[in-house]
Structure formats: C-alpha cells, structure tokens
Amino acid sequence: MKIHYLQHDDLVQACTIEQWATEQGILLSNTQVHKGEAFPDTSDFDLLVILGGRMGAYEEEDYPWLIDEKAFIKRAIAENKYVLGVCLGAQILAHVLGGLVHPHVHKEIGWWPVHFSPQIECTLLQGLPETVHLFEFHGDTFKLPTGVKLLASSAGCENQAFIYNDRVLAVQFHPEVSVEKTKVLAQAAGNVEGPYSQPAAHYMNEQAHFEQSREVMFTILCNFKEQIKLAEVML
C-alpha cells in the first residue's frame, strides 16, 4: 500500500498519519501544493490524503494552485482511487463533488463530541465509537454534494463527515493531530471568541483526547488498508 498526501500549509502536517505509516511499513509521499510542487501520477499511490490549511476551498483567486489541485483530485476520484479529505481537504472534496463551501456562522475550535450515525454503514469508519471527542479547527463549512451520505455531526457543525462511492471519505474534524503540532497551530491562531471556540489553554490540556484521536486515525487508516487489499483481490 502506498499513501500520497497533499499539504497546503506548513503548520498543518500529517502527524499521526505519518506515525501510522511508519509503524505499518507503508510507503508515504507528499506534494506541498502551496509551494508549487508537481502532482504524482495517480498510479503511484493507493490512497490519496488531502490535509487541511488556513485558506478557504473557494479562494482560488488568492491561491490559484487550488485550481490544479482540484483537477488532480477529480482525476483521482474518476479513476476510482481511495481518498481521505481532512478539514480543508473535506471542503475541497465537497467542492469537487458539486457542493457549496462557505464561511460558517461561527468557528469550531477545540475538542467537541462528534456523533457518528449508526444508521449508515461505512466500512471505512468500522470500529469507531458512536460518539467521540475530536479536534476541530475551522471557520468554513459546506453543503452536502448530491450522491454523498452524511456520516457524522456535531453540535457546532452539522456536516462532520461524508462518504462518496464507498471510496471517498471526507472528515471535517482533525483525527491526525499531535500535541506538538497543535501547540504550534494554537500559537499562530491565538484565542478565538465564540460559542464553539475553546481557549488554547483548555484544548491543549486534553491528553486523553489526543490519544483517542490517534486511535480514531489509526482505525480509519487500517480500514482503508483492508479495503484496498480487498479491492486488489477483486481485480
């Protein structure tokens, strides 16, 4: 199995995705899209991961590289690749699939309970608890594109996760966070006021949530690995 991830921001990194890949002996490569690096051939990876970033999925005028990135992602989806989008990555997926991405009425920052729908079966989320505290750091949201299934919600943001064609998973939350990188992000962002914005001093103190988040990330990646293996057998 080979994973390729797209990075948009020096402050937003692969963190526990990289940790899992190292432990599993998985090949991991990346494109720093914001630095103009070239995209790989889609045959070079089995799973494409789209990380977060501080820009908006709709800000193509300010970040023109978004145009080429979206075209690359569309091609990967058309070629039936497995895809995981995180935060901005989820919003880019929503946009690519025809959904509207827009500023939310409030920011959602910190550890908030995310509720996964027990009514919707999704093999890529198999083994996750029905409710779990996950890290949020976003000011935008999206309307669900046609043809996707909503998988999770929170009090502060209804659309927390969706699945498309059983292979494309979008999550608004950040399961890939580490303590060290979250500290850097918190220092850059400062405290934000709002009904769903926790102060950094609060969310940086939640060691148990960081550990549970890592388990969620590892479970999702293991599920992708299993589905990719099954797909290869079916060929």
Annotated model-derived regions:
Residues 50-120:
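Cysteine-nucleophile active-site neighborhood
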Residues 27-29, 100, 133, 149:
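Conserved beta-strand segments of alpha/beta enzyme cores
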Residues 20-23, 64-68, 101-102, 153, ...:
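Glycine-rich, phosphate-binding/catalytic loops in enzymes
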Residues 5, 78, 116-235:
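Amide-donor transfer/coupling interface in amidating biosynthetic enzymes
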Residues 9-10, 106, 155:
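Short coil/turn segments
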Residues 1-81, 194-235:
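N-terminal beta1-alpha1 cap of cysteine-dependent amidohydrolase-like domains
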Residues 35-39, 109, 142, 158-159:
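A short acidic, often aromatic-flanked loop/helix-cap motif at beta-alpha or helix-coil junctions
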